[in-house]
Structures are given as C-alpha cells and as structure tokens.
Amino acid sequence: MHQFKYHKGTLHCEEVNLQTLAQDYGTPLYVYSSQTLRNNYKRLHEALGDLDHHIAFAVKANSNLSVLRLLADLGSGFDIVSGGELFRVIKAGGDPKRCSFAGVGKTTEEIRYALEQGIYCFNIESLAELEFINNVAGSISELAPVAVRINPNVDAQTHKYISTGKAENKFGIDYEETMQVYERASALPHIQIKGIQMHIGSQLTTVSPFVEAVKRVIPLVKELQQTYGIEFFSIGGGIGIVYEEALASGPSNWWSEQE
C-alpha cells in the first residue's frame, strides 16, 4: 500500500499536505514517500523468505540521492549502467561491493573507476565486451568479476520496445552460445567468473514470463555451477504497474469527488 491519501479533500503524502508543498516549492514537484519505499522493499525481501537472495535497485529508475540513501540503509544493492550512477550510489552511502554494472556502453574510464571502487560484478553483453574488460583490468593489474547476460528467448509479454529477452532483441548472448563465452572467460587472465544474468524486459505485469525464463535457464545455471563455480543467478526485469486498472478502480465518480 502506498502512503498517498486524500484528507478532507486535499492530497497528502503520509502526513504532509501536498498542496502546501506545492505552494512552498512550486510545481512541477516530485514527492516521494519514504514509508512506501520501505514497505515495498520489506515486502519483496520477506517474499523471498529463506532463499539466499540479493535485491538490487536499478539506479536508472530513480537516481535521487535521498532515495538511494534510504535504500542503502535498508541493505539494498544497486544495478548501475554508468560511472555516474556508481558515483551517486557511493555519495549516497551505498556499498560498491553490492553493485552490478550492466549496460552495453561501458567506457575504459568507467570500467577502471568501477574496478578501483571494488564493484561486485560487470554484466557483459558480448564476447567483444568480455575481451575489452579483460584488457582494461589488465592495464591496471586488476581482476574483473563478470557475469554473462544471456538471452533466454522468452517473450516478456510487455511492450515490444522494452522487451529484451527474445532472440530478435539486441541484448545479451544467445542461449546456445553461452558455454562458449564462459569457456573463453575462464581462459582470460584478468577475468573472474562470478555468475550468470538474464533480463527479459521491463513493465512486466505478470510473473509467468519470469517463471518460463527461469525454467529455461536453470539447467544452464547448474552446469555453470559445476564447471565454473558461479555464485549467483540474476533474474533481471522490471515488475510493472497496471495503470489502466488503477485508473479504473473504484466508483466512476471517485475522481470528481476529490476535486
């Protein structure tokens, strides 16, 4: 449950009158509920129960320092796609050792910075990127921890422009080529194999695509555990918001009554 409620016809966030905030600070104005963020994090953490799990917030979703600081205090890790995002996480008190560096456009400077800060893992998108990261790590005598992002060829049942897990999508290594990439990674002197990652899309409003993708990848995960001792399987993708149902909920005159 979120903490945005109407009280005597005026919208409040927790106990704060949003009309007063708008008058004091002007509009447009972004207001975040710390209690909602805490509750949602707690619900996800508790839903995973006794499983050995790690929650990583995607900084690209919201890089506000106060939001990042709150999540860091809760123990969250972070998914980053740039050196700038890593800088913001560190500034907010986040632990680089709980950060995974994703994305296809990592620069030499960003890779060096991430290695110097001791990030947990790079998610690599191609064999060429694997070789590139190995070379950068070697130039500063470091060992780069990596996970290969695979494409499981699963339909995320989301908008075609934010689907990333089908064979025709541009992201990740083809499922059938995965073991070849890990074999190459194991031979590179400045690469440390950490795990495996998939990301099938954003704005998913049903868990069935996750289930299908996990079932498809699990045999590969087991083989990688036996062969290379991987530490984790990252299940990427964003749980979505059902906007239409949210707007349609309640009696038809609800909106007019709030004016």
Regions found by a protein language model. Give the residues of each.
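Gly/Ser/Thr-enriched, mixed-charge loops and adjacent short helices
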Residues: 184-209
